[in-house]
Amino acid sequence: MAPKKAKRRAAAEGSSNVFSMFDQTQIQEFKEAFTVIDQNRDGIIDKEDLRDTFAAMGRLNVKNEELDAMMKEASGPINFTVFLTMFGEKLKGADPEDVITGAFKVLDPEGKGTIKKQFLEELLTTQCDRFSQEEIKNMWAAFPPDVGGNVDYKNICYVITHGDAKDQE
């Protein structure tokens, strides 16, 4: 496979769910920005595209280290879907779903996909950015525990990263 085709195939692995995060107008605006940055029009933003974009904005002599750091923010080649995903994650201010799920899994050594309501509530009200009683009340309204007092953290992770509750099957 030619190197350019391999790049495109790897880039195609970006999340397609990102398109549901934005309305059509926003997607079009991101597409226009992507097109401006993709200076050589190959459908992939690379280090030279970034360098050329900075030059077009009057910022010459951008250090390679700075460009490398920008490129490393993506997991691979930056096609439009990856570009949109990166902005979606930045704008939402949330970590990717697998990172959030991984954090919950630490609290679920048996791997059941649930955490006891009482334990989660204690953590949320006593650690780091503590939840208020109002926030706890809202959380249980949105994610009610089952009859055994267990909370489905996979659903919480999905809602944090996608914005809507996952259909229960």
UniProtKB/Swiss-Prot annotation:
- GO terms under biological process: immune response; muscle contraction; skeletal muscle tissue development
Assembly, per entry: Myosin is a hexamer of 2 heavy chains and 4 light chains.
- Give residues where Phosphothreonine occurs: T25, T35, T101
Q: Which organism is it from?
A: Rattus norvegicus (Rat)
| Keyword Repeat assigned | yes
Checking Gene3D superfamilies in the record gives: EF-hand (1.10.238.10)
Give the Pfam families listed for this entry.
EF-hand_6
Relay the record's extra comment: This chain binds calcium.
Q: Where is each EF-hand domain found?
A: 25-60, 95-130, 131-166
Give the N,N,N-trimethylalanine positions (modified residues).
Answer: A2
GO CC, one annotated term: myosin complex
GO terms assigned for molecular function: calcium ion binding; structural constituent of muscle
Biological function: Myosin regulatory subunit that plays an essential to maintain muscle integrity during early development. Plays a role in muscle contraction.
Q: What's the protein name?
A: Myosin regulatory light chain 11
Q: Which residues carry this modification: Phosphoserine?
A: S15, S16, S75
Q: Which gene encodes it?
A: Myl11
